[in-house]
Every structure is written in structure tokens, then in C-alpha cells.
């Protein structure tokens, strides 16, 4: 169990414990609300206190980040291990293979999922907290927090300079101009619960792109989402007239070329929210995407 501590500064004299927890330790309102009723979860100088207690310079406020009730249906000792790129006390960076869903389907709990793999790895009673999601067909890097606190901190950092993500994609045709920003709102397509499209009444959606390599049939791109809409990168490339290779929903499916949309979460930069360490990871482009460029 992760325990956070903070020594009260002179300028924090006279504040309430909840002010220290919300301000200096950056607990979300929801997390603080759940913790304040748990026995010995919040301590002042080693003693359990109410969150309205007044602090003084030199006092030590600590909080134990106990977890919510785990899902028993996710735990299985024989689940395949996830591909772990990095792990510390607070989080993991995973390299998700294409074809593995983030969570099990309600009607097929036995199907492989990243949540089940991670729960099996961490052990019974663990609760995986994915900071972002990748479509089943998308491969690459993502972060899983080990506590709701770290999850909240990283979710707040999404699409800011504190947490940046870049993708590699192979699009059909030769994309021009060689770089730019796609600024086109995205919303749900009429008559579909899955498909998205560019539409005037959609949500603000921005994607930065850069051409890295071209062949006669395909273009390798660097994509950086500035927002996080469902299927954003796939929709924006289709909007440009260059859908991703293998994208059955927004382009043309050809399993002889590639059996999934050619999209890979390639690079991550973020600040570890507890230690303050700057983190940077890359995951090589998978072979099924590399073959398209040969």
C-alpha cells in the first residue's frame, strides 16, 4: 500500500488537513471523500484525525492509498503475463499487443484482456487503473496506475506538457502536405454506436501529423493527438482521404496486408506524479506494420 507524506511548511500554518491533502498532495475530491471514512487512512503526526483538523508548521500529514474493491472475475492465476516495459511502486508502462482488448466483454469474460493479464500479474486483490485506452487493434505503450491517486494525477496530465504521447501509423496513399495539424470536430456517426465522423457539431479534436517515410502505396506518419476523442487518429486520417491501412471501419480491410488498423502507440513522456522523475519510453514499430513499408 502506497503511503504519501507531507511535512507542513511555515506558510501552511493554520490550514486544515483537507487543504493539505487537496493542495500539497493533490488528492482529488472523490478520492479524499472515499478515504476520510476509512480507519487510519489519514494521519496527523501518526494519529488518526478528522480532515478539518488544523495543522502547524513541522506537522506530518500522511495518507494511505487503500484501494476500492477488486473485480474477482478478472483474477486468474493462469492468465498470460503482460509485456511490461517499466514498473515501480506506483505504476507500470505496458506494451499492448494488437488483438488484445483492454477489458473483457460482458458476454465473454474468458477472452484475453489486458485488465485480466495485469490483475493476474499483480495478484489477487489488485485493481488496474489504465490512464488511457487503446483500441483492440492498436498496439503499443500505455500506463497502468497501481492506485486511484496516481491514476487521477496522470489523467489530469493527459494532453498537457506533463504527459505526451506519439503514435506511428501507416496510411494508404502518399500524404501531403508533409506536416500539419488536423483541426476537425469529431462526433458519433448517425445510425451507429461505434463509428465516429467529422461533423460541425462534434467535439473539438486536433491531431498533429508529420510524414516520416513514403512508398508507392503507403505513408509512415508520426501522429500526436492534442485531444483524446474516440477513434480520433483513425477518423482524422480518413478525413484527409488517407485512411489507415487495414482499417475496416474507416477504410478498406485487407487481411492479406495487415489484419488490423496500422496504428501503434510508439512513444511516451510523462512526469512520475509521486517521485517527480521525468520518464521517457519507446516501443518499436511491430513487424506487421514494418512489412507494409518494405
Model-derived features: positions:
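The conserved catalytic core of RNA pseudouridine synthases
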Residues: 124-155, 164, 168, 184-240, ...
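Short, surface-exposed secondary-structure edge patches
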Residues: 50-54, 222, 260
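Short, P/G- and charge-enriched loop/turn segments at secondary-structure junctions
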Residues: 80-81, 193-199, 253-257
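RNA pseudouridine synthases
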Residues: 1-181, 187, 288-292
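Short Pro/Gly-enriched beta-strand edge/turn motifs at strand-loop
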Residues: 65-66, 190-193, 204, 248-254
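Conserved hydrophobic positions within beta-strands
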Residues: 84, 171, 208-211, 244
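Flexible glycine-rich active-site/ligand-binding loops centered on an Asp-His dyad
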Residues: 164, 168-172, 239-254
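RNA substrate-recognition surfaces in RNA-acting enzymes
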Residues: 245-279
Amino acid at each position: 500500500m502506497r503511503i504519501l507524506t507531507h511535512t507542513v511548511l511555515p506558510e501552511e500554518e493554520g490550514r486544515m488537513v483537507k487543504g493539505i491533502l487537496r493542495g500539497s498532495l493533490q488528492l482529488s475530491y472523490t478520492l479524499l471523500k472515499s478515504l476520510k471514512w476509512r480507519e487510519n487512512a489519514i494521519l496527523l503526526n501518526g494519529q488518526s484525525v478528522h480532515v478539518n483538523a488544523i495543522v502547524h508548521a513541522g506537522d506530518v500529514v500522511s495518507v494511505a492509498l487503500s484501494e476500492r474493491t477488486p473485480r474477482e472475475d478478472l483474477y486468474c492465476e493462469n492468465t498470460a503475463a503482460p509485456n511490461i516495459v517499466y514498473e515501480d511502486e506506483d505504476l507500470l508502462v505496458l506494451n499492448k499487443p494488437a488483438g488484445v482488448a483492454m477489458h473483457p466483454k460482458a458476454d465473454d469474460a474468458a477472452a484475453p484482456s489486458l485488465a485480466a493479464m495485469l490483475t493476474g500479474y499483480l495478484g489477487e486483490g489488485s485493481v488496474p487503473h489504465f490512464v488511457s485506452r487503446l483500441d483492440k487493434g492498436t498496439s503499443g505503450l500505455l500506463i497502468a496506475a497501481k492506485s486511484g491517486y496516481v491514476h487521477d494525477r496522470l489523467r489530469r496530465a493527459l494532453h498537457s506538457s506533463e504527459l505526451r504521447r506519439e503514435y506511428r501509423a501507416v496510411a494508404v496513399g502518399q500524404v501531403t502536405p508533409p506536416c500539419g495539424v488536423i483541426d476537425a470536430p469529431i462526433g458519433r456517426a448517425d445510425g451507429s454506436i461505434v463509428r465516429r465522423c467529422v461533423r460541425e457539431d462534434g467535439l473539438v479534436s486536433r491531431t498533429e501529423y508529420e510524414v516520416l517515410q513514403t512508398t508507392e502505396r503507403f505513408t509512415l506518419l508520426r501522429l500526436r493527438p492534442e485531444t483524446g476523442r474516440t477513434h480520433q487518429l483513425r477518423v482524422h486520417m480518413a478525413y484527409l482521404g488517407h485512411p489507415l491501412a487495414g482499417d475496416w471501419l474507416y477504410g478498406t480491410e485487407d487481411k492479406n496486408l495487415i489484419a488490423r488498423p496500422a496504428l501503434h502507440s510508439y512513444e511516451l513522456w510523462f512526469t512520475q506524479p509521486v517521485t517527480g522523475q521525468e520518464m521517457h519510453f519507446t516501443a518499436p514499430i511491430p513487424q506487421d506494420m514494418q512489412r507494409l513499408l518494405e
